[in-house]
Design a protein with these regions (language model features):
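Alpha-helical sensor/transducer elements of the RecA-like P-loop NTPase core
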Residues: 37-90, 108, 123, 140
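Short, polar loop motifs at secondary-structure junctions
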Residues: 17, 44-50, 269-272, 292-293, ...
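A short helix-loop-helix "switch/interaction" segment in the helical subdomain of ASCE P-loop NTPases
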Residues: 90-101, 148
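Mid-core helix/loop region of P-loop NTP-binding domains shared across ATPases and GTPases
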Residues: 1-12, 94-98, 198, 202
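The conserved phosphate-sensing helix
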Residues: 99-108, 153-158
Length: 758
């Protein structure tokens, strides 16, 4: 390389693996004082290594091919035409998806398919995992993935293989994954660095090494969930099986294995491992399929007592009390998730034997009927996370007016619809049942000094001393509470507790759509590290203390009934605010004004059913960073000043959105130098409403609502007259899978955001 010192050169270093190699290249291979316009290009799979080689502006991240381009490449490589695929056209789509849009994978698969008839393509797709192991034409692709695995540091190899327990194309939430890694002992604390932060760094490192694919990113650019490339997963499962690391059960698998030292089992079908297996070796059990048909319940045998992780969240059947009655036997459990997101759960009480799980760190009991945390929980001083948002009444198809047992029982007797079965299954739990989505916490909660996440606490049903003790949870970072119908005294105790939580960075207070949060004005010194704030309930005006939250990144307000200029002026001063969510009468003024020099860091604006807002105005020199506007459910609203938003990329008008002057808005969008996208969910004809006609319609609707409210109030006070109305139809929405309201630090839905704060 000495001869390059005085020459102009162009060098490509392909597939660089380590930073040490790059440092050697810098020190010995390439002259640093060459001023002849030379260039060096480095290719690598590691984003972190790329950043060592160059600044962000000189890094090009190769994107997967678009589906059409990927399909064309596959057909061209396999020497087939589109006409050849008419009988089984979707097989191309499936193969392209399997390859993840990666050109190298498509070329290798296409090369194999070139030797096969079209009729054989589906069989090849079905047996691709075994083809990767046996087909010489695919050996290079398998070898490339194994090489990537072998280059992982030792602390990442187990973390990576653990991903093989999840089904193909499954969205894996970072929070769940990191908590499971911690429970399994894959992650160790480093000095003063929080163990969760170490786990997050492992997660990011796997992304940077292109071993996993980001699937959901929040407004700050933080990756909240990931997926594993299909072919990468096939090879990963093969490695995990060869190393006796994970055993997967599925309907097409045999139900016995000769190896006796698998560490993790994942159920994807209805098959069950035979009892001849030595269960004592298993350390984690995860359920994704149907209830096993053999052996029958209970799900877990006494011989599985060495389990560290038990996760039933992905089960396609309702968890029952019988399934978890012996939970106290699993003394080594560190991670427990018993709330199924795929089916009704009939668990309404935590067994008191849970107090024997002294090492338990994570307790997930959401999507259950559990409404009370037992006293025994206070003995589990290793607990770091309790998430216990219970099944809401709407999940059963009930109305909130059914506040008493008599109403619900009578409703069941006189109706014959799809809810009857669901209600019958819950009859034993009615004495534990409440219509609120929180759970009561016991006295002694302050003993849980390691606790960092606690949600959702029902303040009304919790003891006053327990509420006071919340302020003693000095490590608490995320708190969710419901205050519907809570007394003023308990709300004041909650205020005092919040002021003591100096580590809190996420707070969610829900008083329901007609409840009051005006007691929040009495907060004098809020937790200054707070980054995420969600308030649902009437505020009247914005509390002054919100202006002191200089680290606040996300704020969501619902049913707040805010008005006047103070609201937007105060919010506009928050220097780090990136996401503003206003929902259903959060603001009740006619003009929502984003003033000059306000909202310096705002990136996303989400407005949902602003019943009284008629215009959204962006003044000059406002919201310089605003890139995305989502508007749903508002009527006769006019957007003014889009031209003043230099970085806007997308304006989305969702279901129920009605724009008064859509043509004017489209004109501003078309004239904008940034060429933003204007998305319309509903037809153009639904917009351009005449304001005068709209005002008359709104008045008529308001009168109807008032009359309906009076009738409902009267009928709730008189049970017998209500009986005659009970046969009304109740609309039931059964939400499954990743669409279930779950984690979020961006508040609205799992499909677009994630509720985990920061």
């Amino acid at each position: 390389m000495e001869g390059l010192k005085d020459k102009r050169y162009f060098i490509v270093f392909d597939d660089l693996w380590t930073i040490d190699m790059w440092r050697w290249i810098q020190e010995f291979a390439v002259a640093s004082n060459n001023r002849k316009g030379s260039r060096i290009v480095v290719t690598t799979r590691d984003v972190g290594l790329a950043k060592e080689c160059s600044g962000d502006s000189h890094i090009y991240q190769l994107k997967p091919l678009q589906p059409v381009d990927a399909a064309n490449l596959l057909l061209r490589k396999s020497r087939k035409r589109q006409e050849d695929m008419e009988r089984d056209g979707n097989i191309v789509e499936k193969l392209v998806k399997k390859c993840g849009g990666l050109p190298l994978a498509i070329l290798m698969v296409g090369g194999v398919l070139a030797t096969k008839k079209v009729a054989e393509w589906r069989q090849f797709y079905d047996h691709l995992p075994s083809e990767l192991e046996t087909n010489p034409s695919l050996e290079a692709m398998r070898r490339m993935i194994i090489l990537s695995y072998n280059h992982l540091p030792s602390h990442l190899k187990s973390c990576f293989l653990y991903l093989s327990i999840f089904p193909e194309d499954f969205e894996i939430k970072r929070r769940h994954l990191v908590n499971r890694w911690i429970a399994k002992g894959f992650i160790k604390a480093r000095g003063r660095v929080n163990i969760e932060d170490v786990g997050k760094s492992y997660f990011i490192e796997l992304i940077n090494r292109s071993m996993i694919i980001p699937s959901r990113v929040n407004v700050e650019g933080t990756v909240k969930s990931c997926r594993v490339h299909d072919i990468m997963r096939d090879v990963m499962v093969s490695i995990a099986r060869d190393e006796n690391f994970v055993y997967l059960t599925a309907d097409d698998n045999v139900t016995s294995v000769t190896e006796e030292n698998f560490r993790h089992v994942s159920y994807h079908g209805r098959k069950f491992l035979k009892e001849c297996i030595d269960w004592r070796h298993f350390r984690s059990s995860t359920m994704f399929g149907e209830r096993p048909i053999e052996p029958p319940a209970p799900l877990f045998l006494p011989s599985t007592r060495m389990l560290r992780v038990l996760d039933l969240h992905g089960a396609h059947f309702g968890i029952t009390k019988k399934d978890i009655k012996d939970i106290g036997l699993f003394r080594h459990l560190k991670y427990l998730n018993i709330g199924s997101a795929k089916a009704y759960s009939n668990v309404y009480r935590i067994p008191r034997s849970i107090g024997k799980l002294k090492g338990l760190q994570t307790l997930e009991i959401r999507m259950t009927d559990i409404s009370t945390i037992p006293n025994e929980i206070c003995n589990l001083q290793s607990l770091r996370s309790i998430r216990c948002k219970k099944t809401h009444w709407s999940y059963l198809g009930l109305q909130p007016s059914m506040g008493c047992l008599m109403d619900m029982m009578y409703h069941q007797m006189i109706t014959r619809n799809s809810h009857e079965k669901a209600l019958k299954s819950r009859m034993p739990c009615f004495r534990h049942w409440s219509i609120y989505k929180g759970v009561s916490v016991p006295r002694g909660i302050s003993k849980l000094q390691e606790l960092q996440t606690l949600e959702v606490v029902d303040i009304k049903r919790s003891d006053a001393n327990a509420i006071k003790e919340l302020g003693e949870l000095v490590q608490l970072k995320k708190l969710g509470v419901v205050t519907k119908e809570a007394t003023e005294q308990k709300c004041k105790l909650l205020c005092a507790a919040i002021e003591k939580l100096t580590s809190l960075y996420s707070l969610n207070v829900d008083a329901d759509y007609h409840g009051s949060l005006e007691w929040l004005h009495s907060v004098s010194s809020p937790p200054l590290p707070m980054r995420s704030l969600k308030l649902v309930g009437r505020l009247g005006e914005m509390p002054d203390w919100i202006g002191s939250l200089t680290h606040l990144v996300k704020i969501y307000l619902g049913h707040s009934e805010l008005k006047g200029d103070k609201t937007m002026e105060l919010l506009g001063t928050l220097p780090k605010l990136m996401l503003l969510g206003l929902r259903q009468n959060a603001y009740v003024g006619k003009s929502l004004v984003f003033g000059a020099r306000a909202f310096p860091n705002l990136r996303e604006l989400d407005i949902f059913y602003p019943d009284r807002v008629r215009e959204v105005i962006f003044e000059e020199d406002t919201s310089y960073q605003l890139a995305k506007i989502q508007f749903r459910g508002g009527r006769c609203v006019e957007f003014i000043g889009i031209k003043h938003l230099p970085r806007v990329k997308e304006i989305s008008l969702g279901l129920g959105a009605r724009v008064a002057k859509l043509g004017d808005l489209q004109g501003e969008v078309e004239a904008h130098p940034n060429h933003p996208v204007l998305r319309l969910v509903e037809d153009w004809s639904m917009h351009n409403i005449d304001p005068s006609e709209h005002e008359a319609l709104e008045e008529e609707l308001a009168n109807f609502r008032r009359q309906h409210q009076q009738e409902r109030s009267t009928n709730n006070r008189k049970w017998w007259p209500w009986r005659q109305r009970a046969q009304s139809v109740f609309i039931f929405h059964h939400i499954q899978g990743s669409n279930v309201e779950d984690d979020g630090d961006d508040f609205f839905s799992c499909t677009s955001h994630d509720e985990d704060a920061c």
